[in-house]
Amino acid sequence: MYAAMVLCVDDNVGRLQACLDELGISDNTLVVFLSDNGGPIANGSWNGQLRGNKGSLWEGGIRVPFALKWPGVIPAKKMNHTFVSSVDLLPTFAAVSGADQFGPVASDGMDLMPLLQGEPGEYRDRAFFWRRGDMKNVAVRYRNYKYIMNRRTNEEYLFDLHKDISERDNMA
């Protein structure tokens, strides 16, 4: 079933691209593709070397694919390993469209366009936070370090994700 879902997404992304081409707007359209979470265990999903799954605070639950395409604006076939978040989408879309970003409302997100175009930025110097809906588990990532606390058991975990992407060597 999972393979069929992936094939369906692939087919429909192709249909979307064909439609943009047919309308003559593919060169003036920012296409964004990302997932909301890692794969669930219930259907046999495998997150490779990443520990955890959908709904967990391990990398297998929160690290997702994120791809963008905008011919002539974002260089093609480039991989960027800077850690970003979906909260960066609103400020990015506002900047791209020229819209007044939020009025009186602030955002934790950052405009990704300078990063996507290869300009230096301060993207590495911010912390990212996650929690489970029940607040029993919380996590924070700063640069290459990630801390997780299970508030039910008071277990703490600290990982250097550059050296241990599988989150096996607890340094806490």
Ranges and model annotations:
Residues 1-2, 75:
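Glycine- and acidic
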Residues 7-45:
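Metal-dependent active-site segment of extracytoplasmic phospho-/sulfohydrolases and closely related
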